[in-house]
Amino acid sequence: MLNLTGKNALVTGIANNRSIAWGIAQQLHAAGANLGITYLPDERGKFEKKVSELVEPLNPSLFLPCNVQNDEQIQSTFDTIRDKWGRLDILIHCLAFANRDDLTGDFSQTSRAGFATALDISTFSLVQLSGAAKPLMTEGGSIITLSYLGGVRAVPNYNVMGVAKAGLEASVRYLASELGSQNIRVNAISAGPIRTLASSAVGGILDMIHHVEQVAPLRRTVTQLEVGNTAAFLASDLASGITGQVLYVDAGYEIMGM
């Protein structure tokens, strides 16, 4: 049985109860982890209120604002972790964004600003958060991010996000190579399409889900909690020999030729 008792885990990217990050947070909590949750701050406090109410049953010991495009907020987040916890064991990176206009139509029409924004939030944030977490993972650790098949195959309308996920998976390998000597493992979970706030921006997402339900060996898509189970496994000592990998949790869709 998975046991994360005594482990400190920071979970990023929870927006609502359909977020994959929410499924991961629930399973880490069920395994006994001590949770810290970040939220995206906004002027009206909309996300803070919504996420705070959602995660309250998990009793997180830290609840922090963190916009990954704001270097000061990132530093403040990890300073607080150091001061309150002293150590970080698990980092969950569930952050992705691209402008809606760049997730439909022709990829060649992606704007320069849209391309930069997608890679900054979806890819570089993993590098930056991992760098901030590194000195706090004094007893080793596990860093886990979320990818998608569109990072290795051309998926209609996924466009610039596919490029961002390809960069994310490469970043996993480079971070795993760098951090392995400190017993810090870095892995990605490539989940099948799930209806989330982020995926709703992708043109034709419902068609993608229906296609997976028809073609995947299990004849269904996966749930947030199934992804959460995999994350809890990767965060645990049961996965102590796994790093630099992309694990597909997609009902088997990735293996199909057509």
Curated annotation (Swiss-Prot):
It catalyses: a 2,3-saturated acyl-[ACP] + NAD(+) = a (2E)-enoyl-[ACP] + NADH + H(+). Pathway: Lipid metabolism; fatty acid biosynthesis. GO terms for molecular function: enoyl-[acyl-carrier-protein] reductase (NADH) activity; identical protein binding. GO terms for biological process: fatty acid elongation. Keywords: Fatty acid biosynthesis, Fatty acid metabolism, Lipid biosynthesis, Lipid metabolism, NAD, Oxidoreductase. The keyword Electron transport does not apply. The active site is at Y148 (proton acceptor), Y158 (proton acceptor). Its EC number is 1.3.1.9. CDD domains: ENR_SDR (cd05372). NAD(+) binds at G13, S19, I20, N67, V68, L95, K165, I194, R195, T196, L197, A198. InterPro entries: Enoyl-ACP_Rdtase_NADH, NAD(P)-bd_dom_sf, SDR_fam. It comes from the Bacteria. Substrate binds at A98. Catalyzes the reduction of a carbon-carbon double bond in an enoyl moiety that is covalently linked to an acyl carrier protein (ACP). Involved in the elongation cycle of fatty acid which are used in the lipid metabolism. Belongs to the short-chain dehydrogenases/reductases (SDR) family. FabI subfamily. Homotetramer. This is Enoyl-[acyl-carrier-protein] reductase [NADH] FabI. It comes from Nostoc sp. (strain PCC 7120 / SAG 25.82 / UTEX 2576). The lineage of its organism: Bacteria, Bacillati, Cyanobacteriota, Cyanophyceae, Nostocales.
